[in-house]
């Protein structure tokens, strides 16, 4: 939680409509889903255990840089395939409780490789957690392998190669995250071309901490979805491009406010994007670290920005339509949305 008051804490409980609305989530980091109690529990397996209070303290930060340090501190506690199995399974249980039918989840593969972990073994743990979660909770989940900008293009290529290795085992795409201010999208062109040539889908975090030029760069990488796109509104030509091409934008309201990327609730462009015809989706980003949930993000949109139930249903539909699911599965889930569950 940031040192400012948690934005979602002031919201009323999500409505019955929101709780019952079938949803998809497209911008969700596995490692950002670890609740403090679980992080403390995992740390007990090793020689540097955390108390719950110490774990909670890791999730306090004043801005985006502080958030990245908190994320790093949390991920350093993950060491074994069993750790990843635990958090994958528990994430799927949480998704089911929020009526999320499908999620596409970022895994920080770049960090695993940077730390010289045995990622092949870690992936087996991830798949065990996913398979158990799907069996018990009925949630559909696909993996997106995430590279870290500040590690550079060679490390990003290693992430993409791992995605290609596992692309027939529920790995659907690749993305690039981290600090946009340190490495522009153009550095990763070869990695994105390699991924596309091998049938992987493409996403990119862009316009979160920098301006519209980063979003243009992501589009030039042939990114099919844009994570955050917080500053697209500053460029009318870019807005027109997003609308004309119906490029899905992964909006993360609480995240943008808690990292201070958006200084005031009123300044967030969600409503502006929706009214202009941008294909927006709602997402949590790092729900445990921002003390939010997808139901609360929908409640945020309704209570702060005045979205009607019908408009929230349209946003939920965008989530399924913008997913990287195969056409048949996508139609199945859209039919469940239309049927109400």
Descriptions of predicted regions:
Residues 2-200, 209-214, 220, 224-225, ...:
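Metal-cofactor-binding active-site regions of metalloenzymes
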Residues 202-204:
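Conserved hydrophobic beta-strand within the GNAT/NAT acetyltransferase core sheet
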